[in-house]
Each structure stands twice: as structure tokens, then as C-alpha cells.
């Protein structure tokens, strides 16, 4: 579960290493984001020659959470940490590579590009 002020690692090759959630999108009273939800983030740590700079604000989609995601068959998939992929204003991924596994819950029309770039889909 991601909320405002949560820090996430970045699972793409945009050059950002760590981001801070500044807003969970989807309603004025919405508090938590899970896998597949869109959040507004600011870059807290970035590589020197990356595509993004520290302090930049982007949309991002949550791809992994330590809280996990419950499936209809009763199984629970958890990860060691929280991770997100940076998106542009059209909600398309900025990076060209995805690092680490992503969950099958991202297989919607909006995020098929992320699923196809990911090395492993759980």
C-alpha cells in the first residue's frame, strides 16, 4: 500500500533511482495505491546522465508492493520492496526497459507496454 510520502524504487531505465509519492490519483479522498494504480511522484535520487532530473514531477504506475496483491484463487504475491515505472502525461512509459518482475494485474489496455517490456510477469 502506497500513500503520500511513501518512497519507491524506480523499475525502469529513465535514470531515476528513487521517487517520493506526492499524491494518489483517483479521487480527492483516496488514500492508498496498490499494484496498477497511478500516483504522482517527484524524483528524489537520479543518475547523473539520466533522462530525468532530481525534483522533476511525473506520473507513475505502481508495479510492485511489499504489501502484496491478493488473487481470486486465494494466492498472495508479495515483493521485497515497492517499485514504480515513470509515465509521461499520456500515461505511456518514459523508459525503454523495465527491471524486475511485474504482476499480471497490469495486463490492462493501459499498461500492456509495461508488461511486454518486463523480463518476468508473475
Swiss-Prot record:
Q: Which family does it belong to?
A: Belongs to the universal ribosomal protein uL14 family.
GO biological-process terms attached to the record:
translation
Q: Which gene encodes it?
A: rplN
Which CDD domains does the annotation name? Ribosomal_uL14
List the keywords (alphabetical). Ribonucleoprotein, Ribosomal protein, RNA-binding, rRNA-binding
Q: How does it assemble?
A: Part of the 50S ribosomal subunit. Forms a cluster with proteins L3 and L19. In the 70S ribosome, L14 and L19 interact and together make contacts with the 16S rRNA in bridges B5 and B8.
Question: What function is annotated for this protein?
Answer: Binds to 23S rRNA. Forms part of two intersubunit bridges in the 70S ribosome.
Please name the GO terms that the record assigns under molecular function. Answer: large ribosomal subunit rRNA binding; structural constituent of ribosome
Q: What is this protein called?
A: Large ribosomal subunit protein uL14
**Gene3D superfamilies named among the record's database cross-references:** Ribosomal protein L14 (2.40.150.20)
Please name the Pfam families in this protein's record: Ribosomal_L14
One of the record's GO cellular component terms:
cytosolic large ribosomal subunit
